[in-house]
């Protein structure tokens, strides 16, 4: 697995220039002060923000290239993301949050639930499945967000301050 990120992303007066490559098995930490573009970079890889120029390529598949009008929808990318603070869908149950990625890929609810069972057990979420996100502690919500990011077996896992507020 290789991720090649060679792009510029512009948002208003902010411009982020990226020229990085990552290989399978690498663990990379992006560090910098507030407002330096760390989350923006992750959002571009996840497909939540389109690149302005350049390209983003994962295993020879172009995910985003403005010049060629190529943009793979975030739900179809082999990328999982855990947002800072979890960011669960408030109108969905915990189970619906966990299986969201599979459902977005047209997998039936019953099959998605079966596929999710291992993660549900590993993360200790069985008792929480019918609850709403507002009923969870910060750590519980973070575990749900991590399970949701892993459910599609992504090639790349992006973590935006995933340990903040995590229960011990």
Annotate each predicted stretch with a short phrase.
Residues 61-66, 103, 110-127:
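Conserved ABC ATPase "signature" region
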Residues 151-155:
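A short, proline-enriched helix->beta-strand linker immediately N-terminal to the Walker B motif
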Residues 157-161:
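Catalytic Walker B motif of ABC-type/P-loop ATPase nucleotide-binding domains
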Residues 31-33:
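The feature captures the beta-strand-to-loop junction immediately N-terminal to the Walker
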Residues 132-136, 140:
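Conserved ABC ATPase signature
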Residues 92-101:
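Short coil-to-helix segment of the ABC ATPase nucleotide-binding domain corresponding to the Q-loop/switch region
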Residues 146:
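Hydrophobic anchor residue at the start of the ABC signature
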């Amino acid at each position: 697995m290789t991720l090649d990120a060679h792009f510029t992303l512009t948002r208003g007066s902010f411009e982020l220039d990226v020229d990085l490559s990552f290989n399978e098995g690498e663990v990379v930490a992006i560090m910098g002060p507030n407002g330096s573009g760390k989350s923006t970079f992750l959002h571009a890889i996840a497909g939540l923000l389109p690149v302005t120029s350049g390209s983003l390529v994962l295993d020879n598949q172009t995910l985003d290239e403005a010049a060629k009008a190529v943009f793979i929808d975030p739900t179809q990318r082999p990328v999982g993301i855990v947002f800072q603070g979890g960011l669960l869908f408030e109108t969905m149950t915990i189970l619906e949050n966990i299986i969201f990625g599979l459902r977005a890929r047209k997998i039936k609810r019953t099959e998605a639930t079966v596929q999710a069972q291992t993660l549900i057990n590993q993360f200790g979420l069985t008792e929480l499945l019918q609850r709403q996100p507002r009923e969870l502690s910060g750590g519980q919500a973070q575990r749900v967000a991590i399970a949701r990011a892993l459910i599609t077996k992504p090639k790349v896992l992006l973590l935006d301050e995933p340990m903040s507020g995590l229960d011990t």
